[in-house]
């Protein structure tokens, strides 16, 4: 029987699904907007729809899949498949048995993992990290997630490792929504960058960020909006992206000082869109924060691109023997 | 034949040597002031003298030792036994074949390790970390060194891991002598605390720190001076120690956010002298910097005490079969 696995990347704005073969090659895909209605029901339906569409695109029935791996933002119990808490997904503020619910509907095994964790694992096994022994993945998007890979394994600690975005680089500095002050994410998370852009406009600064947002037809300052504004020479965009780069660089240098890893891999919505030019700026900005600047590790860009989260999620399902 | 190992802790102010038996029990010890004359010759002689005295105290000849392990501050090549650079030891600004030189003089094998690395390994195998799977040791002294233990092994990365003292917590903040700004050590290293105390006195602040230093007969604000000043209610000492605690807490919380380790072990001259009351203050100060304050790991005090560095160094010599 054909071996087909589905991987789903559940995001705050979209649900991305891929169906891959035994060699991890993408055979089918689908993308659906994440419903914003209250309650988990509509999100569950949308996930099932994305799986069904991706399976159809790969010419298999959902029930013929060897399994579905789902990467979800927030706290995940990978043993039980319960999405403990996902503040960015409407209706998932409370624990929800996501894997079990989807499994019953689709008719195949379902496993759940953290979205950044599975994306970093994707880079480890199939992407920029495939020849590295150790690295730190920094996923720069709405928030800034991270994954620590040591001796070619994800490091979990007591279960909650990888919160580089919430490390402090500026005591008493900017607040993030959680109330923590001066963390890397307070400067670099896209949501917080948008809050700062709003505040700047209210204070009288000029920018094309929000005009571009409307032109493109977005409700948020998406990665594309930031990229286009930056390329147009917008001063506020340049300033806020510059501050985000410095914050990411400080936190990345800290983790290099502590763990002396072989590389930093930059991914996520903003990281992947900005690509190597911005990764190079992060590398330069790391220099003053490194104890040994002469042995600064490379800052690489995630290779699996937009589908990386979904492809990484498919790795949650082991190959059948 | 009796199995006796010597461990040496080479410090900027003193050289501590112990001779231990196969069960790591201390059978002899010696302490010698670190010579301040230029050139490595006098320091090498002092190390040999410390080994000889500790061996005599344990009733063995130096040549009968199974080996000597030396923990040295600075960059160490543990393969070749070369002390690459030890800025705190007069005469060791250039690479020096320390293990080979001592081995020829003493007549037994000599191994070299980083001082904080061997002290943390001592805690891992014989001290506060003996039942932990993973922890970070923070050695609070003249500088602030650290050691990362993962799955009961020291983590070295590409060879230079463990520089938690040089991670940034306050971009653009206080300078440390290396020129790095706003690092934890800039606030918490004893040398930098002394610099700040001098500056405060020049700015008109009152303190008993320097009077106590002279009473005790020291040339530096030693750990004992800080402790006695703090206990006397000195306001400047309380303020600077408080700021050091907050800096250590911020960096410790960062490493917990990244690695989610089971514990922080606090050691070093100041850490060991201040003991559990200050470790408890570090734990409290970590709270606002933790992403998951409810699962804050314990902050423990190193158990091997003053001789921990020398005992840890003895572990560089494996047991003979």
Question: Where is each model-derived feature located?
Answer:
Chain A
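Glycine-rich phosphate-binding loop of actin/hexokinase-like ATP-binding domains
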Residues: 130-188
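General beta-strand structural signal in soluble alpha/beta enzymes
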Residues: 110-114
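A charged helix-plus-loop insertion that forms the helical arch/lid used to bind
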Residues: 81-95
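Conserved A3 ("GATE") glycine/threonine-rich loop of ANL adenylate-forming enzymes
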Residues: 13-14, 118, 142-145
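ATP-binding/phosphotransfer module of carbohydrate and carboxylate kinases, centering on a glycine-rich
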Residues: 1-67, 77-82, 100-108, 122-132, ...
């Amino acid at each position: 029987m054909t071996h087909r696995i589905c991987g789903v990347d559940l995001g705050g704005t979209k649900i991305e699904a891929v169906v891959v073969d035994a060699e991890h090659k993408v055979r089918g895909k689908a993308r659906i907007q994440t419903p914003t209605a209250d309650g988990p029901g509509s999100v569950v339906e949308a996930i099932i729809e994305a799986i069904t569409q991706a399976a159809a695109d790969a010419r298999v029935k959902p029930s013929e899949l060897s399994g579905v791996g789902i990467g979800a933002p927030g706290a995940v119990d990978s043993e039980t498949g319960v999405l403990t808490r996902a503040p960015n997904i409407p209706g998932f503020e409370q624990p929800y048995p996501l894997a079990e619910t989807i499994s019953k509907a689709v008719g195949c095994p379902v496993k759940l993992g953290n979205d950044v964790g599975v994306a970093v694992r994707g880079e480890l096994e199939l992407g920029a990290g495939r020849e590295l022994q150790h690295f730190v993945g920094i996923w720069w998007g709405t928030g800034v997630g991270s994954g620590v890979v040591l001796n070619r394994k994800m490091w979990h600690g007591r279960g909650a490792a990888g919160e580089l975005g919430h490390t402090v680089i500026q005591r008493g500095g900017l607040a993030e929504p959680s109330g923590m002050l001066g963390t890397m994410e307070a400067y670099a998370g896209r949501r917080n960058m948008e809050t700062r852009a709003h505040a700047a406009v209210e204070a009288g600064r000029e920018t094309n960020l929000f005009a571009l947002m409307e032109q493109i037809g977005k409700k948020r300052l998406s990665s594309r909006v930031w990229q286009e504004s930056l390329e147009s020479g917008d001063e506020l965009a340049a300033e806020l992206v510059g501050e985000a780069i410095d914050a990411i660089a400080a936190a990345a240098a800290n983790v290099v000082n502590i763990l002396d890893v072989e590389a930093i891999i930059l991914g996520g919505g903003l990281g992947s869109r900005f690509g190597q030019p911005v990764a190079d700026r992060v590398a330069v900005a790391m220099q003053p924060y490194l104890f040994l600047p002469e042995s600064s590790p490379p800052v690489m860009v995630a290779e699996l691109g937009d589908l990386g989260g979904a492809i990484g999620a498919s790795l949650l399902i082991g190959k059948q023997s």
